Amino acid sequence: MTTQPFLGRRGFLLGGAAVGAGALLTACTSNTPATQDAPVGGAGNNAQPGKPITIGFSAPAADHGWIAAITKNARAQAQKFSEVTFNATEGTNDVNQQISQVETLINAKVNVLVILPFDGKALTAVGQQAMDAGIPVINLDRVFDTPLAYRTWIGGDNYRMGVNAGSYIAKQLKAKNVANPIIGEVAGIDSLPLTQERSKGFTDALAKAGYKVGPRVSAQFTPESGEQQTANLLQSATKLDALWNHDDDQGVGVNAAIENAKRSEFLMVGGAGSKNMMTLIKNDSSPIKATVLYSPSMASTAVALARLLGQGTGIGEFAEHDIPAEITTYSAVVTKENVDQYADVGFDS
């Protein structure tokens, strides 16, 4: 498999339509011929090479550790399959540019599309355009407005993420017989549905245990905002028993604020599953005792599913002949006891 380098954004803008579809794409191209057609339905070994296919991929700019891992994982998964050509657009947070890039993939007649939209609502129409053109779409994480825009959705469970964080904290506090605990929360961007779902799950789990959320701030999924908002929370809350931070990328700043404030009287739970948080959990020398997964490994699964869709193949061990319409990943709680088990899905933040 050979890889052509990405064309920069400036190159795309200057090249214009004359450059055509190739200006938007980078291809990992296999020169190995297919050895057999993949079987139809659920039977057979999915690891065996099937017919050659091209998978188009589009995601936002890799300006966040989690998003960077999404693209990295997708590419790495595609490289495992000798018969797969992987055409990826340059990541962008410009909705109109992402739409244009997906349209180029459609015009290039890729066999399957994997799309993590910067804005699910805004890219719904182009997802449906692909489906109408006979190109199945794997909608990754940020969901389109209608199932008509995708063949299969795969993503995380934001509500369950909050539930599992709250349940873990409640269990730890009850084991220590902490009465009337003060439980803080460093949320992500409050206007986003995903943040609202995470917070609701957290609140519901604590309420089930007879607890409630105390001091709460919202950050922007960045280390800088995490540090600033956590510093504000710690200044207003002179005592804490537990703290949940929604996102391990902003958790870099959250941890810095905790260290700067020289606070260690509480336990902290992170969110998503970054490598550095897993290292802190394993070392067990800071307030960080767990993180709740929202793993970018879902991108690897999305590409594997795209390959099967393109080859008309089901999942080998499943009784059903077709790829499921929806797959929701599980938000496992990573602790000192099981961190080695999950180290392979940790991402750089």
Regions found by a protein language model. Give the residues of each.
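N-terminal secretory signal peptides
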Residues: M1-L7, G15-A27
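Bacterial lipoprotein signal-peptidase II cleavage site
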Residues: C28-D37
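Hydrophobic alpha-helical
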Residues: I115-D132, F202, A219-T279
